[in-house]
């Protein structure tokens, strides 16, 4: 049995808790204090779109019995990691060309490292959070926590039988708070759960576990319900400018603050419901789950970045970017964003792909993920219309005689391929006939 994970409350010791101010962490904090632990509360400001007053959260923690409570501003680091993911195309989950932008894994990478670093400053070496044993976050936080503090111990009230026996459900937790003098009113429970940060929102569980339940039960928190025809959404022309792989301007306005840049991108994309997707994915433990995702700013930057990418880089570079991005996306999802194999892939794309991405893309956004690209401008474009123009051009880069020579060279590999197909045919792997997998070959 691992001695890193504590299954019983460490009485008399400092215990850090990632405190959201919600029912679960409020009840857990008060319960830990009453049972003899010394709880310290840490709240990450991730720019959550559904959080109104961050400064009130540490005050709540102190009222529930925290020895100390701190608000850690993680927004700049989160924005930087979001840009890194855009630069590397670190997204491995998509359906029908619509992408999930790994916004929750990015948030966990930042939260897991920055909160544990803050705990180390307070000499707090035991950490608890609200992740359940069935999800991805329990492993992500475990990895990032131990990477930041090798002496860290993990205590999760939701893995403690005593806590579960006494406060195993939302009703029991709310009654516990009321019995201890806190005027707690349970909110109306939604048909799904939501987790969010500045980069995106995740809606999952409960009714959304049923695949016959559609996206239309979700109330977006970063955009609009574009599927509702009664919601008026006017087309909007948007320009996005990148410099050396970094988004710097929106509609001609330059942003020196990367957090404000993302906020504005979210507002622009959110007006259209851009970046919403419905995905079935494999969790870290290989069981499948379903989620509805929002990421309007990430989607806007991704579209513009990849438009410039395809106009600037050659085919092999683009292919390697996509292959590395798929692998890096999986590593990010698994909580390995700072592992050596991930850093190697990140550095490669950020150095050799992103640095060349300078330019501006103009788009028209409509409803949901419906958009058109109107213009692409970059000093680094290798796209030159006259190279392949169907019109007659002066000083053409090649002529018909050049193409004849190029095609003649193809005789070498066409002959090799034809001979190889003959070998397969003799071996019975290919059959002749009208329904054959390849056209009939001359038997001579």
UniProtKB/Swiss-Prot annotation:
Organism of derivation: Actinobacillus succinogenes (strain ATCC 55618 / DSM 22257 / CCUG 43843 / 130Z)
CDD domains reported in the protein's UniProt record: ASS (cd01999)
Annotated residues for binding of ATP: 18-26, 44, 130, 132, 137, 195
Main EC class the enzyme belongs to: ligase
Disulfide bridge map: none
Catalytic reaction(s) noted: L-citrulline + L-aspartate + ATP = 2-(N(omega)-L-arginino)succinate + AMP + diphosphate + H(+)
Chief site of localization: cytoplasm
Subcellular location: Cytoplasm
Residues that, per the record, bind L-aspartate: 132, 136-137
Alphabetized InterPro entries for the sequence: Arg_succ_synth_type2_subfam (IPR023437), Arginosuc_syn_C (IPR048268), Arginosuc_syn_N (IPR048267), Arginosuc_synth (IPR001518), Arginosuc_synth_CS (IPR018223), Arginosuc_synth_type_1_subfam (IPR023434), AS_cat/multimer_dom_body (IPR024074), AS_multimer_C_tail (IPR024073)
The gene coding this protein: argG
Subunit record text: Homotetramer.
Name used for this protein in its record: Argininosuccinate synthase
Pathway annotation from the record: Amino-acid biosynthesis; L-arginine biosynthesis; L-arginine from L-ornithine and carbamoyl phosphate: step 2/3
């Amino acid at each position: 049995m691992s001695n890193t994970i504590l299954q019983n409350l460490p009485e008399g010791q400092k215990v850090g808790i990632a405190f959201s101010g919600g029912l679960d962490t409020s009840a857990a904090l008060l319960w830990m204090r009453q049972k003899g632990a010394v709880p310290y509360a840490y709240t990450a400001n991730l720019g959550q779109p559904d959080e109104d007053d961050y400064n009130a959260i540490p005050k709540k923690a102190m009222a529930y019995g925290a020895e100390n409570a701190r608000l850690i501003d993680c927004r700049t680091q989160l924005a930087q990691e979001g840009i890194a993911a855009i630069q590397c195309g670190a997204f491995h989950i998509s359906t029908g060309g619509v992408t999930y932008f790994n916004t929750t894994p990015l948030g966990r990478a930042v939260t897991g490292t920055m909160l544990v670093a803050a705990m180390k400053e307070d000499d707090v070496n035991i950490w608890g959070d609200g992740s359940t044993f069935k999800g991805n976050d329990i492993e992500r936080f475990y990895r990032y926590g131990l990477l930041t503090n090798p002496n860290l111990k993990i205590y999760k009230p939701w893995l403690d039988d005593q806590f579960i026996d006494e406060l195993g459900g939302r009703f029991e937790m709310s009654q516990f708070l009321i019995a201890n003098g806190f005027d707690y009113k349970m909110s109306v429970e939604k048909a799904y759960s939501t987790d969010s940060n500045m980069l995106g929102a995740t809606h999952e569980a409960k009714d959304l576990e049923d695949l016959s339940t559609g996206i239309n039960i979700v109330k977006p928190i970063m955009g609009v319900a574009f599927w509702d025809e009664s919601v008026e959404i006017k087309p909007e022309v948007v320009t996005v400018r990148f410099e050396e792989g970094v988004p710097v301007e929106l509609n001609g306005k330059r942003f020196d603050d990367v957090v404000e840049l993302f906020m504005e991108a979210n507002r622009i994309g959110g007006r259209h419901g851009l970046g919403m997707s419905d995905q079935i994915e494999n969790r870290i433990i290989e069981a499948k789950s379903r989620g509805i995702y929002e990421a309007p700013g990430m989607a806007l930057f991704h579209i513009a970045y990849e438009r410039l990418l395809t106009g600037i880089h050659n085919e092999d570079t683009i292919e390697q970017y996509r292959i590395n991005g798929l692998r890096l996306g999986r590593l990010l999802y698994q909580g390995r964003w700072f592992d050596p194999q991930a850093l190697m892939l990140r550095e490669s794309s950020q150095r050799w792909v992103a640095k060349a991405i300078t330019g501006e893309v103009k788009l028209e956004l409509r409803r949901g993920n419906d958009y058109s690209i109107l213009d692409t401008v970059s000093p680094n474009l290798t796209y030159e219309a006259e190279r392949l123009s169907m019109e007659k051009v002066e000083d053409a880069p090649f002529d018909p005689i050049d193409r004849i020579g190029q095609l003649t060279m193809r005789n070498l590999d066409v002959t090799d391929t034809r001979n190889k197909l003959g070998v397969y045919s003799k071996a019975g792997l290919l059959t002749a006939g009208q329904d054959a997998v390849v056209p009939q070959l001359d038997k001579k």
